[in-house]
């Protein structure tokens, strides 16, 4: 993320590793889906996760209507793989029931992207972990438990 919270979609970020990413991954990096923030006052769940080994971080917001993810948005600070997998995760989770969204795995995200390099596999963990954290936050709020973890 840039200083203003925007995602760095500089094509030069792909200059070296572009040969390692397929067209779907590059598209989700250059044109991430559901990027940005949802209004905190109107969200039902929030997840914040990071990977200390590489410095990647992801924030994810959801709104839930009738047991389905009605809106989902993310902000990610990380490599092209982290941004692309976060984007794909939100595309997969949008409109799903909570249980369907909860069942999305790292492998589902990687498969939907057509694969990512093995050394970037850890990037796919952020989106799934952030989604699970947002769902847990929604459940706490729904059940009337105070505060976030």
What residue spans do the PLM features occupy?
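Short Gly/Pro-enriched turn/cap motifs at secondary-structure boundaries
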Residues: 48-53
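Short beta-strand elements
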Residues: 56-67
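Immediate flanking context of iron-sulfur cluster ligation sites
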Residues: 68-77, 111-114
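Active-site cofactor/substrate anionic-group-binding motifs, chiefly glycine-
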Residues: 61, 73-77, 92
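C-terminal binding/interaction regions
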Residues: 2-39, 46, 65, 96-149
């Amino acid at each position: 993320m840039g200083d203003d919270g925007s995602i760095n979609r500089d094509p030069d970020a792909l200059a070296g590793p572009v040969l390692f990413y397929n067209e779907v991954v590059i598209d989700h990096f250059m044109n991430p889906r559901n990027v940005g923030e949802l209004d905190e006052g109107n969200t039902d769940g929030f997840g914040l996760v990071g990977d200390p080994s590489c410095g990647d971080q992801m924030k994810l917001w959801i709104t839930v209507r009738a047991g389905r993810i009605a809106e989902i948005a993310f902000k990610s600070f990380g490599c092209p793989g982290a941004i692309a997998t976060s984007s794909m995760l939100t595309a997969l989770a949008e409109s799903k029931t909570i249980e369907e969204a909860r069942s999305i795995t790292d492998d589902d995200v990687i498969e939907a992207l057509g694969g990512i390099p093995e050394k970037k596999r850890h990037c796919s963990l952020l989106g799934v972990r952030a989604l699970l954290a947002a769902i847990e936050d929604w459940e706490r709020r729904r059940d009337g438990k105070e505060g976030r973890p």
